[in-house]
A protein has these predicted regions:
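Chalcogenol-based redox active-site neighborhoods
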Residues: 1-136
Length: 136
């Protein structure tokens, strides 16, 4: 799963990011990767995003609201010093492990790189880091 944390409909860079991921959503899904975007917008703001996106039918992935910023903070897409949310993009495997992340003041928009890297990371075999005592 690819989780995108964005600041909301009022953030032009965020909207550019969502529009960058929209046409390649099917490519990610073909690789077994679903997308979801989490915003600080209210439910009304999310509905506005869908109608003003300029994309027929709205975005091809769910938009969720995190007004309390609990999820932003749990993923550390939050600057404690500045007391403000950050842009975040996370690749999460089937076991819930974060395999790749980008947290920044700018949204991540290199969809081609991320698709290729996601396929590489998710297709790696999972080997134990250290052998258990008495093994090997």
């Amino acid at each position: 799963m690819l989780v995108i944390f964005y600041l909301g409909d009022g953030c032009l860079h965020c909207i550019e990011q969502l529009k960058a991921f929209s046409p390649v959503t099917q490519d990610f899904e073909a690789a077994g990767i679903s997308l979801v975007a989490i915003s600080l917008d209210t439910a009304e703001g999310l509905n506005k995003s869908l109608t003003t996106s300029g994309i027929e039918g709205g975005y091809p992935f769910p938009l969720l609201s995190d007004r309390s910023m609990k999820i932003f903070k749990a993923y550390r897409a939050f600057d404690d010093f500045e007391n403000m949310p950050l842009h975040g993009t996370f690749l999460i495997d089937e076991e819930g492990m974060i395999r790749w992340q980008d947290i920044s003041y700018q949204p991540f928009e290199d969809t081609a790189f991320l698709l290729k890297e996601a396929q590489r990371l998710l297709n790696q075999t999972k080997a134990p880091i250290l052998a258990k005592e008495g093994e090997g």
